[in-house]
A protein has these predicted regions:
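Alpha-helical bundle regulatory/interaction domains
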Residues: 1-99
Length: 99
């Protein structure tokens, strides 16, 4: 995962009052943090906007990831963390050309 994406996501979670472990190269850590803090993040995502800086692809991906997280929360996290990670990784690979 691109370091700037990990940094933006970590800052967003931190702004929501959530400390998360980012020791994996996929998005498992993110979806575990979201699931473990679903009520807190629901409120945060409904009341804030998050401006990203950087290149267009990074901004596009981070905002798309935020939309995916919001939808997942709206569906009470019924899909597994693994399914959500696979979705995020698939889109990440397509956008950034990573195998």
């Amino acid at each position: 995962m691109k370091p700037e994406i990990k940094k933006i996501i970590t800052e967003m979670l931190s702004d929501a009052g959530i400390n998360s472990c980012t020791d994996t190269e996929d998005f498992t850590w993110l979806f575990n943090a979201v699931k473990d803090n679903s009520e807190q993040l629901r409120a945060y995502l409904k009341t804030t906007t998050y401006n990203t800086t950087g290149d267009y692809k990074t901004t596009f991906f981070v905002n798309g990831l935020r939309a995916i997280i919001t939808t997942w929360l709206d569906n009470d996290c019924t899909d597994s963390v693994e399914q959500m990670n696979e979705l995020a990784m698939r889109e990440y690979r397509k956008l950034f050309g990573v195998n």
